[in-house]
């Protein structure tokens, strides 16, 4: 079997993606650092803020964040200590644990949100322009759909 190597343009697209994503993440991280929060913690707060009753089962939160259960536990330990979230057991099934956004966590997220949105606009959206944003959204939707199809198969 022979390897179907990437063409020059395919290699360029792939390398640009692989190198740009960490650069974007670093820029977003730097732009909210003054709020004493990491992007990882910010993402947790956002997911919880969008959930019913501002809480999610730990397994669902881990899936949403693409973290292992132990990775989520490590992520949440500091957030619990900071008072941004609380963990609680499900009253109907003690094996199920919830992460719940506290008022302090909501306030932390709301304080960082304007700087995060500005960072997303400056580093991600503005360089693309309106047409580029539309195209990129469609392209990533196609990739996401493909990944979901292959994972379900």
Residue ranges of model-derived segments:
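N-terminal leader segment of winged-helix/HTH proteins
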Residues: 1-35, 84
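N-terminal helix-turn-helix DNA-binding core of bacterial DNA-binding proteins
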Residues: 22, 26-70
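C-terminal regulatory/oligomerization modules of transcriptional regulators
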Residues: 1-8, 130-153
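Pre-recognition alpha-helix immediately N-terminal to the DNA-recognition helix
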Residues: 16, 43-47, 107
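Alpha-helical linker/hinge and terminal dimerization helices associated
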Residues: 17-20, 24, 28, 65, ...
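Charged, amphipathic alpha-helical coiled-coil/dimerization segments
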Residues: 77-138
């Amino acid at each position: 079997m022979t390897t179907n190597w990437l063409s020059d343009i395919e290699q360029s697209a792939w390398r640009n993606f692989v190198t740009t994503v960490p650069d974007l993440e670093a820029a977003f991280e730097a732009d909210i650092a003054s709020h004493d929060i990491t992007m990882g913690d910010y993402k947790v707060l956002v997911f919880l803020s969008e959930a019913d009753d501002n809480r999610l089962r730990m397994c669902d939160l881990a899936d949403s964040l693409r973290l292992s259960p132990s990775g989520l536990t490590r992520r949440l330990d500091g957030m619990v200590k900071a008072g941004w979230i609380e963990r609680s057991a499900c009253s109907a099934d003690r094996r199920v644990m919830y992460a719940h956004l506290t008022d302090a966590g909501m306030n932390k997220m709301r304080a960082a949100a304007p700087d995060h949105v500005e960072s997303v606009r400056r580093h991600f959206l503005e360089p693309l322009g309106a047409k580029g944003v539309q195209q990129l959204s469609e392209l990533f939707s196609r990739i996401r759909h493909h990944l979901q199809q292959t994972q379900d198969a």
